[in-house]
Amino acid sequence: MPKRRDILAIVLIVLPWTLLITVWHQSTLAPLLAVHKDEGSDPRRETPPGADPREYCMSDRDIVEVVRTEYVYTRPPPWSDTLPTIHVVTPTYSRPVQKAELTRMANTLLHVPNLHWLVVEDAPRRTPLTARLLRDTGLNYTHLHVETPRNYKLRGDARDPRIPRGTMQRNLALRWLRETFPRNSSQPGVVYFADDDNPYSLELFQKVTRRVSVWPVAFVGGLRYEAPRVNGAGKVVGWKTVFDPHRPFAIDMAGFAVNLRLILQRSQAYFKLRGVKGGYQESSLLRELVTLNDLEPKAANCTKILVWHTRTEKPVLVNEGKKGFTDPSVEI
């Protein structure tokens, strides 16, 4: 039987060690416990006075969802009653890179307020690929189609150079606009012919036109860029181009935009299908709408490049073989 003196000695030895171990555990675990407590507690209880509680009750996942909602699902920007509608006319046709190019273009147009995308397919009917893509973009769009007649084509996919690709599709878009809006419509708008293989600066869509606006286009005519020639008074007096500079309007299709009212009032104005030399398609329309003196130079008096006439390299698919190596049902 241990004596009282021995028990007291044991207590006096063990007690200090117990206290030391307890203090050490508390100092080590306290921060970790505090973190777990904060994660499990309701943050709204610690909201500073006067602050919005919603700002203090979001996890990282909540923040990601908010950013995604704000940035993606509110595109395109809200419609404005003070801005004109920009009608972007885009001819397109089936090819391996069609979806890629339309996707790239849609990603630009999603940032433009008051935009209406008029997509016209060179096809006997609207294709599911284009229909799905347009629906999924969230853009305001109209989906049309008209097939270029076979007698306007050469063998294979090569076309008669006198009938440039997209002519009939652009004309159908012009007809749609005239059938949709009355001739004396007060609807403010701009019509721009934008091919699906070009990159466009967002600044381009901020240029409002009274009649016909013009600007340079890069990588056309064998030059770094072609541009209207502007004098010191800010008037277009000619064209900086090598190919047939004496054309009435020596300008690329991507280098001008037309006021909607002008399109509606001049119902005879279309792109000519026959009797038009190569490079004169733009002139065949513009000469029915304006004179050289009516043109409005934009893009810092036509000294700034806002659109590039690029072409996507045709993909080499030799390894697909005649039967196809990959699953043809996978949409590219």
From Swiss-Prot:
<feature type="topological domain" description="Lumenal">
    <location>
        <begin position="28"/>
        <end position="332"/>
    </location>
</feature>
<feature type="region of interest" description="Interaction with galactose moiety of substrate glycoprotein">
    <location>
        <begin position="243"/>
        <end position="252"/>
    </location>
</feature>
<feature type="modified residue" description="Phosphothreonine">
    <location>
        <position position="103"/>
    </location>
</feature>
<dbReference type="GO" id="GO:0005576">
    <property type="term" value="C:extracellular region"/>
</dbReference>
<keyword id="KW-0472">Membrane</keyword>
<keyword id="KW-0808">Transferase</keyword>
<keyword id="KW-0333">Golgi apparatus</keyword>
<keyword id="KW-0597">Phosphoprotein</keyword>
<protein>
    <recommendedName>
        <fullName>Galactosylgalactosylxylosylprotein 3-beta-glucuronosyltransferase 1</fullName>
        <ecNumber>2.4.1.135</ecNumber>
    </recommendedName>
</protein>
<keyword id="KW-0964">Secreted</keyword>
<dbReference type="InterPro" id="IPR005027">
    <property type="entry name" value="Glyco_trans_43"/>
</dbReference>
<feature type="binding site">
    <location>
        <begin position="91"/>
        <end position="93"/>
    </location>
    <ligand>
        <name>UDP-alpha-D-glucuronate</name>
    </ligand>
</feature>
<dbReference type="GO" id="GO:0000139">
    <property type="term" value="C:Golgi membrane"/>
</dbReference>
<feature type="binding site">
    <location>
        <begin position="195"/>
        <end position="197"/>
    </location>
    <ligand>
        <name>UDP-alpha-D-glucuronate</name>
    </ligand>
</feature>
<dbReference type="GO" id="GO:0050650">
    <property type="term" value="P:chondroitin sulfate proteoglycan biosynthetic process"/>
</dbReference>
<feature type="glycosylation site" description="N-linked (GlcNAc...) asparagine">
    <location>
        <position position="301"/>
    </location>
</feature>
<feature type="region of interest" description="Essential for transport from endoplasmic reticulum to Golgi apparatus and interaction with SAR1A">
    <location>
        <begin position="3"/>
        <end position="5"/>
    </location>
</feature>
<comment type="subunit">
    <text>Homodimer. Interacts with SAR1A.</text>
</comment>
<feature type="active site" description="Proton donor/acceptor">
    <location>
        <position position="282"/>
    </location>
</feature>
<dbReference type="GO" id="GO:0015018">
    <property type="term" value="F:galactosylgalactosylxylosylprotein 3-beta-glucuronosyltransferase activity"/>
</dbReference>
<comment type="pathway">
    <text>Protein modification; protein glycosylation.</text>
</comment>
<dbReference type="GO" id="GO:0005789">
    <property type="term" value="C:endoplasmic reticulum membrane"/>
</dbReference>
<feature type="site" description="Interaction with galactose moiety of substrate glycoprotein">
    <location>
        <position position="319"/>
    </location>
</feature>
<keyword id="KW-0325">Glycoprotein</keyword>
<dbReference type="GO" id="GO:0006486">
    <property type="term" value="P:protein glycosylation"/>
</dbReference>
<feature type="binding site">
    <location>
        <position position="170"/>
    </location>
    <ligand>
        <name>UDP-alpha-D-glucuronate</name>
    </ligand>
</feature>
<dbReference type="GO" id="GO:0046872">
    <property type="term" value="F:metal ion binding"/>
</dbReference>
<feature type="binding site">
    <location>
        <position position="197"/>
    </location>
    <ligand>
        <name>Mn(2+)</name>
    </ligand>
</feature>
<keyword id="KW-1133">Transmembrane helix</keyword>
<feature type="topological domain" description="Cytoplasmic">
    <location>
        <begin position="1"/>
        <end position="6"/>
    </location>
</feature>
<feature type="modified residue" description="Phosphothreonine">
    <location>
        <position position="108"/>
    </location>
</feature>
<keyword id="KW-0464">Manganese</keyword>
<dbReference type="InterPro" id="IPR029044">
    <property type="entry name" value="Nucleotide-diphossugar_trans"/>
</dbReference>
<feature type="site" description="Interaction with galactose moiety of substrate glycoprotein">
    <location>
        <position position="226"/>
    </location>
</feature>
<feature type="binding site">
    <location>
        <position position="165"/>
    </location>
    <ligand>
        <name>UDP-alpha-D-glucuronate</name>
    </ligand>
</feature>
<comment type="similarity">
    <text>Belongs to the glycosyltransferase 43 family.</text>
</comment>
<feature type="binding site">
    <location>
        <position position="122"/>
    </location>
    <ligand>
        <name>UDP-alpha-D-glucuronate</name>
    </ligand>
</feature>
<dbReference type="GO" id="GO:0005975">
    <property type="term" value="P:carbohydrate metabolic process"/>
</dbReference>
<comment type="function">
    <text>Involved in the biosynthesis of L2/HNK-1 carbohydrate epitope on glycoproteins. Can also play a role in glycosaminoglycan biosynthesis. Substrates include asialo-orosomucoid (ASOR), asialo-fetuin, and asialo-neural cell adhesion molecule. Requires sphingomyelin for activity: stearoyl-sphingomyelin was the most effective, followed by palmitoyl-sphingomyelin and lignoceroyl-sphingomyelin. Activity was demonstrated only for sphingomyelin with a saturated fatty acid and not for that with an unsaturated fatty acid, regardless of the length of the acyl group.</text>
</comment>
<keyword id="KW-0735">Signal-anchor</keyword>
<feature type="binding site">
    <location>
        <begin position="309"/>
        <end position="311"/>
    </location>
    <ligand>
        <name>UDP-alpha-D-glucuronate</name>
    </ligand>
</feature>
<feature type="glycosylation site" description="N-linked (GlcNAc...) asparagine">
    <location>
        <position position="184"/>
    </location>
</feature>
